[in-house]
């Protein structure tokens, strides 16, 4: 009823405004910066675990073959999806040694999109919101 009362020009402008507003949201959820055709596994120490929306983050301190360390930012899904997979805000604590598998960044920097994690006592966690194995 409301749409039929609108002038065609107003309706077109409103539709265009909605379409333009949707582009940033789609870009925000893009995973184009990750190479989903590859996986990299690193062992490191949890520096920080951020349980936040819209994405949680793990920051791992990882040593290379020469003993040089780098901080690996690893992007996960949001808390809602992680909860359904058995995660909690206390799953990871600073100082915990873990093995993480990620889809690496395409640009070659350290970091990536979370695929799976092996905790110190052997339990493996995956994130279904990034199509990770369970």
Where are the regions a protein language model picked out?
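Short nucleic-acid-contacting surface segments enriched for D/E, G, S/T with interspersed K/R
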Residues: 84-99
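Conserved hydrophobic positions within beta-strands
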Residues: 44-46
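OB-fold/S1-family single-stranded nucleic acid-binding modules
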Residues: 105-129
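N-terminal secretory signal peptides that target proteins for export/translocation
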Residues: 1-8
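Short, structured beta-strand/loop micro-motifs enriched in basic residues and often containing a Trp
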Residues: 76-84
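Short boundary/loop segments of OB/S1/cold-shock single-stranded nucleic-acid-binding domains
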Residues: 26-40
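Bacterial N-terminal signal peptides
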Residues: 13-22
